[in-house]
Amino acid sequence: MLDTLRRTFIRSQAVLLLLAMQFVPALEGRDLSLDPQTEVAQPSSKTPASRLPEVHLDGTYFVRNGKRFLPVGAHWVPAKAAMEWPTEWDPKDIEADFAKMHELGFSIVRLDMLWAWFEPRPGDYNPTAFQQLDYLVSLAHKYQIYLHPSLFIGGEVGEAWWDVPWRLGRHPHADADMLRLESNLAAEFGRHYANESAIVAWDLTDEPPFWIVGDQTTDAMAINWTHLIVDGLRKYDKLHPIVVGTSGQEIDHGPFRADDISPFVDLFSVHPFTLYAPDLFPDALLSARGTYGAAFEIALSQGAGHPVMIHEMGASTAQFSPERVAAYDRAQMYSGLGAGSIGVDLWCYTDAAPEQFHKVPYLRTPQETGWGMTTWDRQDKPLAREFKKFSQTVSRLDLTGLAPAPAEIGIVIPDEWAKPHGDFSHFGLTGPASIPYLSTQDGDAMPGQRQPTFSNANQWLMSSALTAFILARQAGLKADFPREYGDWAKRPMLFMPSPITSTGDAFLAHVHSDFYEKARKYVESGGFLYASVASDGAIPGMASLFGARIVDRAPGSEVTLKFVEPFGDFKPGDTLHYSVPTASIESWGTLIEVSSAKVIAVDQDGRPALVTNTLGKGKTLLSAYPLEHYLASIPAVFDQPEPTQRIYAAFRDWAGIKAAFQSDQPSVEVSELQGDHRGYVILVNHSASAQNVTVSTILPVRNVSRVQADGSKPIEMEGRSWRIQIDPFDAAIVEWSK
C-alpha cells in the first residue's frame, strides 16, 4: 500500500528480497495441481446467486444494466494469512470475509494477484492460482461484489517486496525479456477472464513504479510498460476498463503520472494519503487541508483527460483514534464524490491479526497493523459504520444525465510538468536542423547523464496549486487544472499563482514564454486572469496585460497588505499579514511599476501590492507577492479563518462570476453533479465545528431534498436558498430539481 512518499518513513536501506522465500521455494519442484492444502472449495450456499451484470465506462461513470453506479469498497488483504493467503489458502475464512464485506455494503473489492504465485517460472503459469481466482469470482457473484484484480503484485504492505525468483536483477519496466513475459501474463489473464462479468476493471499493478526500481524508472519506461501490458490484456479482453493503480504520481511528478499513461488507460486512480505528504499537508490528520486531499488529486488527474477513482485512502488506528480516521475518510469520500470520483476503494478492509505482528512486514511497520475498517475478527470500527452509511447513500443517487459541474477557475499546469520527459513537440522548432538542438536541462540527452529530477520545483508548484485550489473552494468557486496546451480558455477565470509565473531552469514549474500572448487574447475576449509573482517571476509583455511591470526584487521577512480602495468586502484600511517562509527569490515579492492598472492595496512600505486592470472585455488582478506560497508551508493554516480567500471572492464579484450554488460559510465546500433540470449538491464541512449553512442558488430550483442512507427528506426553501446543519467533517447530499 505504501507509495514512494510513505516508504521514506519506514523502509530500511535494503530491499527485503528475502521475503520472496516465503512464497517461491515452496513452489520449486512442487506439483502445482490442486492438493488438499490448496484445494479450492465452492461457495457454501447451494443456491446460486444472480450473476453480476457486465460493467463498462460511459466516459463519466461506470454503468451496469444500463444504469450508472458508483462502486464502493476496499482493498482486501486477509487478517490471518495477509499477503500469504494464496499459499495459506482457507476458503471458509475467505468466504466469511466476503460475507462481511457484503454486510458492510461493498460493491467492489480490490485484491492482489501475486506475480510470483501466478508465474513461478518464466512463462509457466500456476493452475492453482487461476483456480483460486475462479473461486473468488464465484464468491463475487454470490455476494454481488465486483472484483478489481491488481496484477504483477510484489509489494503491498510495508516495505516488503515478494519478488519473482527468476528476475535476476532485471528491470521489470525496462528489460526486453521481462516486458515480453509481463505482456504475456497479462494476455493470459485476458484469455481466462475476457468475458467474466464479475470483474469490474483491471488494475495493471499497485503503486508503480515497482518499489524495487522506483528511483530507476523513467517516463519512457513507464509509458512503454503501460502500453505493452494494456496490449497484452487487449489481445483477448475487449470488455473490461483498465487503470493503473498509481499513488502520488501527480503530486510527486512520478513517471506513471496521468499525463504519461493517458493514451492507454480508461480511467485514473488516486491514493490520497495526505498524512504521508507532510510537505504538501503540514497538518493534523483531521484538518481542513488534509480533507481536501482527494478532491485536489482527482482534479489534478482529471486534467489529463479521463475520469478518476479513489483507489486507496485512509489512516491507521494504530496511529490515530478510530473516530478521527472515520471522520477523515468520510469528509474525503464526499469531497471526492463532488469532485467527480467514479468510485471509492479504501485501504483497507481489515486489520491484521495479532499473529502477523510477529513477522515481517508487520513486525517492522507497526502502523500497518490497524488500517482496516474492521478489526481482525470482523468487528466494525467507526470507519465501517461511516462507510456503510456512505454506501447506502450513494446507492440512492440517480446519475443519469449528470456530470461534475464545469470549473469556474482554471489553474493552468505547465506543459513542462505534463509532457513526457524528452518530448520536444512544443519547442517551437520546425523542420530538419543541420545543427541539432540540445538542452543541458534534459539531463539524459547528454551522454552518461540520467533523467533529472526537480523535486523542489515540483513541491513549489504543487503546494501553490493546492493552496489556490482550496482558496477557490472557500470563495465558492470550483477550480480545475487544464494543461498549458489544453482547453483552459473555456474557463471564465484563469489563475496563475507563483511559481506558474516564474522563470528558471526548473522548467516544470512555469509556463512557456509564448503563453502570455494567448493569455492577453483570452482577457481581451472577456476572460478574467489572476496572477501572483515572486522575485523569480518573469512575464513577457507584462505591462500590456496587467497594466504594471516588474522593476526589481522586494526582499523581506514580513509582508502587510493594506487596502487603499474598496474591493469585494475589503474596505480602505483593512490589512492582511503574511510571514515570508524563506530568504529566497522563490519567497520574496516584487517591486512593480504601475502604468494603466489601479492600485487596490499597498505593502508595508506603501508600494503597489495588488493592482487591477481592464483589457478589452476582460479584467486582470495581479499580486506583487506570492501569497499562495506563503500559506502553503504554514501548519494548520486553514484550520482557522484564513482571509486570503476574500481576495479570490472579491475578484469573483468584480468579474461578475456567480456559481450555480454557494454557501455562506467558507469552510463548507460546495460542489455539484449537474444535469439540465436536476442534480445533486454535495456539501462538505471541512472544519472542526458544526456549521448551520445557508445555501443559495442562481438557478430556478423548485424542490430540494436531503439524500440519506435511509431515504430522502424534503428541505423547505426560502426563495432561492435553504438552510442545513452539517456536523464537523461531515457532509450532506442535496438533490435539486427545477
Where do the language-model regions lie?
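Active-site mouth of glycoside hydrolases
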Residues: 50-265, 350
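The substrate-binding groove and active-site-proximal loops of carbohydrate-active enzymes
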Residues: 79-90, 114-131, 165-181, 205-222, ...
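Catalytic-core region of carbohydrate-active enzymes that cleave or remodel glycosidic bonds
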Residues: 226-241, 262-267, 271, 281-354, ...
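Extracellular ligand-binding/catalytic regions of CAZymes and related secreted enzymes
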Residues: 378-394, 432-433, 471, 598, ...
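Carbohydrate-binding surface patches
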Residues: 404-456, 461-466, 501-504, 518-520, ...
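A glycine-rich, often tryptophan-bearing local segment used as a flexible ligand/cofactor-contacting loop or short
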Residues: 506-590, 596-602
